[in-house]
């Protein structure tokens, strides 16, 4: 990996190249890559377990929320680990199960922000040309699937260093509801 390489993840490096090519135009509202692995966004008092387990890589909005990779199961290929949303107002959730799912979510069109993302069409074309991917058609269904797949493990991991987090309790409640609904359909 050269010193000019953004990250150890080829997919993320390609996104960085795309972002640089369309800059200053936005391709997803509020999204912007920042220094890969910059743990300062976790806060100076973040526990070691959090600093070791999360790899921040992008701002999610204009007010301090960010995305981070969750080093799940010590996977060597970081493009296969879940992407976590860490909100500036305390929100915390699993945004995508892996990097390519995340890229698809970035392409979702929100009619309210159409004027703020002039490079969205260029991004969608790039996404299809580069990875053969299209925008997620049903973000809520993807969220549910990702929560079912990774939610319990993520909450268990988070609770190893923060056992009084109401956001995690909410995630666990949401996960239990999803599991119950899935069992009822079973």
Enumerate the predicted regions with their spans.
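A surface-exposed partner-binding patch
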Residues: 1-79, 136-186
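Residues that form generic nucleotide/phosphate-binding pockets
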Residues: 18, 102-105, 126, 130, ...
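Solvent-exposed, non-transmembrane amphipathic alpha-helical segments
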Residues: 77, 103, 119-122, 178
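Compact, glycine/acidic-enriched structural inserts
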Residues: 81-119
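An amphipathic alpha-helical core segment
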Residues: 111, 115-155
